[in-house]
Amino acid sequence: MISELEPFYERVLARPGIVLLLGGIDAGKTTVAVELLRRGLANGHSVALVDADVAQSTVGPPTTVGLRCPGPDELTRESLRVADELSFAGTITPRGHLLPLVAATSTLVAAALARGCDLVVVDTTSFVSGLYGQLLKYHKLQLTRPDYVLAFERGGELEPLVGIARRFTSAEVVEHNVRTDLPARTVEERMIFREEQFAAYFAAGVSRWKVKPSVFMPTLPPEFDLALLDGIVVGMEDGRGSCAGIGVLEYDDAQNVLRMVSPVTHGVRGLRLGSVRIATDGKSRGPVDFRNLFRTD
C-alpha cells in the first residue's frame, strides 16, 4: 500500500494542505492517515489529524469528532487517543445526523488551521453508499475544502463520491485501489471495539454530581420526565464552541434527580443531548429518538 501511494505522498509533502480520506469499512484510511502525519513531521510540517469517524474513533471517545496535533513521538494509538480538541456529534452513525457531524468536522478543521497546522488529514466514517452517504460527503467536501481527496476504492463503491469530488471541488482527487479479498471486521467486532473505547474513557476515573434540568440543549420542556434521560451520552460544552468531554446521565429514582457521570470535572457550561444510551462500562443501551423523547415532530 505504501509504495503504491508514494507519488501521492510526495505531492502532498511538496505542497501540504487539507487531505480528506474517503473509504468503506476497514479500507486502510487510518493507517494512511498516520503515515501522512509521520512523513509530514519528518519533513518539518506542523500536522493535525481530524478524526470524524464517530463510531470507530482514533482521537477521543465515540460520538465525538477529535482533533490531535501530534509531535514526532505521539503517533501511537495511545498517544493519538488523547484529543487536543473535541466537537460533539452525539451519534455513532451518520444516518439521520448529517448536520452535527458535518458541523463538528468543519469546526475542527478550522481549529487545526488556526493552530498553524499546514498538513491537516481528515479521516471520515465508512458511510459512503446511498443518497445519504453522498449528501454527507458532499457537505463535508464543501465545508472542509480539501486540497486533496484520497479515495480508497473497492469494487467501484466510491464511483459516485469520486465523481462528486471531481465535479464540485477543486481538490486533486486520487483513487487508491484496495484489495477486495481482505477480511473486514464483523458488526459485532466493531461494536465490541466501540464499547471498549467508551469503557476506557470512563475507566480513567469519574465523578458524579447533580445536573439542573435547565442546562440542556435541546431545552427540556416543562414537566419533562427526567427518568427518560437515564443513560444518554451528553457533550459537555465549554461555552466557547468546544467540547470538554462526554458524560453519561444517571437518573436517581429515589430522589428524582439527574447526575452526571464523567471524568470531566470543570470547564462545562452546558450539556448537549446525544442520540445514544450507554452504561459507564461502555455497553450499549440502544439509540435515542429525539422525536419520541420530546414527543414532537
PLM region spans:
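Nucleotide-state-sensitive switch-loop elements of NTP-binding domains
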Residues: 2-22, 48-121, 128
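Preference for solvent-exposed, low-hydrophobicity sequence contexts
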Residues: 1-15, 21, 39, 45, ...
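The conserved Walker
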Residues: 25
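Hydrophobic/aromatic ligand-binding patch that stacks against planar heteroaromatic rings
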Residues: 39, 59, 139-140
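Phosphate/Mg2+-binding loops and adjacent switch elements
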Residues: 111-169
